[in-house]
C-alpha cells in the first residue's frame, strides 16, 4: 500500500504536457507560487536552512540534474544521489533556461563535479526541483556556462549532505526544456 502511495505521488509530481521552455517556465512558476509557504518554512514548517547569509532574498527551488532512472531509484529508495564528493550537487539553473543548450549544461555540470559523469547530455536531460527542510550548503564554486549567443551565464551551486529524501521535499520532476 505504501508503495502504491509513493507511485501515485511520483506520478502527481511529474511535469507533463509541456513542449517548450516557456511552458515549463510557467509551470514551475505556478508550482513555486503554490508552494511559497513550503519554500519559506520547509515541508515540516521549518525554515529552509541554507548555510550562507541569504540566497538573494527569498528562498527558492533548487534543481538536481540526473537521468530519469536515477531519479526514480532515489525517490523510491528515499535517498539523494551522490553526484559530487559533498553528497548531492544542486543548482539554481532552471530547467527551462532558453539560452542554455543541453550539451552546454552537461559540460558545465561535468566541470563542476569531481565525482559524477555528465559526459552524455542524457545525464542532464531530466530535472528534479526540491525544497529542503534540512541544511543545504552554498558552494564557493559556480556553474559557468556559455549561452547559445556566446555570452557567459553563471549560476550558484549547492551541496546537500547525503541523507534521507522525504517525499515532501521533491516539488516537481520532468524533462528539461533547454535551448536546442
From Swiss-Prot:
Short name of one Pfam family: RolB_RolC
EC number: 3.2.1.-
GO BP field: carbohydrate metabolic process; cellular response to auxin stimulus; cellular response to cytokinin stimulus; cytokinin biosynthetic process
Function: Hydrolyzes cytokinin glucosides thus liberating free cytokinins.
Keywords: Cytokinin biosynthesis, Glycosidase, Hydrolase
GO MF terms held by the record: beta-glucosidase activity
Protein name (database record): Cytokinin-beta-glucosidase
Induction cue: Down-regulated by auxin but induced by cytokinin.
Tissue: Accumulates in young leaves and shoot tips.
Amino acid at each position: 500500500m505504501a508503495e502504491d502511495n509513493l507511485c501515485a505521488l511520483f506520478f502527481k509530481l511529474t511535469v507533463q504536457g509541456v513542449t517548450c521552455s516557456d511552458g515549463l517556465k510557467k509551470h514551475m512558476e505556478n508550482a513555486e507560487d503554490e508552494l511559497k509557504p513550503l519554500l519559506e518554512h520547509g515541508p515540516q514548517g521549518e525554515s529552509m536552512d541554507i548555510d550562507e547569509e541569504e540566497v538573494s532574498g527569498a528562498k527558492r527551488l533548487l534543481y538536481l540534474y540526473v537521468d530519469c532512472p536515477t531519479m526514480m531509484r532515489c525517490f523510491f529508495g528515499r535517498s539523494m544521489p551522490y553526484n559530487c564528493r559533498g553528497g548531492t550537487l544542486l543548482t539554481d539553473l532552471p530547467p527551462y533556461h532558453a539560452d542554455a543548450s543541453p550539451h552546454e549544461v552537461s559540460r558545465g555540470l561535468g566541470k563542476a563535479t569531481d565525482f559524477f559523469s555528465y559526459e552524455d547530455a542524457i545525464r542532464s536531460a531530466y530535472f528534479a526541483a526540491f525544497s529542503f527542510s534540512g541544511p543545504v550548503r552554498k558552494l564557493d564554486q559556480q556553474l559557468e556556462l556559455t549561452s547559445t549567443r556566446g555570452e557567459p551565464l553563471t549560476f550558484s551551486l549547492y551541496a546537500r549532505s547525503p541523507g534521507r529524501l522525504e517525499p515532501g521535499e521533491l516539488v516537481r520532476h520532468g524533462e528539461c526544456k533547454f535551448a536546442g
